[in-house]
Amino acid sequence: MDLVRAHVFISGRVQGVSFRAYTRDRAREAQVKGWVRNLSDGRVEAVFEGTRPAVQKLISWCYSGPSQAQVERVEVHWEEPTGKEGIFTIVW
């Protein structure tokens, strides 16, 4: 099955609400590779690489996030998959 890669930026109240941990857990369950991190401007940034259905499901989840989050915007940039991402991790 073909791989896809999405570079995603999530805005709103998305830091301090376990967004990264929930994203990591959901990505691992879906066997999606990549990473997630907080940005200094208050957004969360993530790279998802996996099958199209799995990546699209993760992106859809980002629109709501964990129950404590208040997502205002999700920006998705589709990129060429690299095949080099490992197990999904939180980048510090």
Swiss-Prot record:
The entry's keywords: Hydrolase
Domain of life where this protein originates: Bacteria
Keyword RNA-binding applies: no
Ranges in a coiled coil: none
Gene Ontology molecular functions: acylphosphatase activity
SUPFAM superfamilies with a match to the protein in the record: Acylphosphatase/BLUF domain-like
Enzyme Commission designation: 3.6.1.7
Membrane-spanning parts: none
Active site (UniProt): R20, N38
Catalytic activity from the UniProt record: an acyl phosphate + H2O = a carboxylate + phosphate + H(+)
Pfam families with a match to the protein in the record: Acylphosphatase
NCBIfam families the UniProt entry points to: PRK14441.1 (NF011013), PRK14444.1 (NF011016)
Similarity comment: Belongs to the acylphosphatase family.
Protein name: Acylphosphatase
Naturally occurring in which organism (per UniProt): Chloroflexus aurantiacus (strain ATCC 29366 / DSM 635 / J-10-fl)
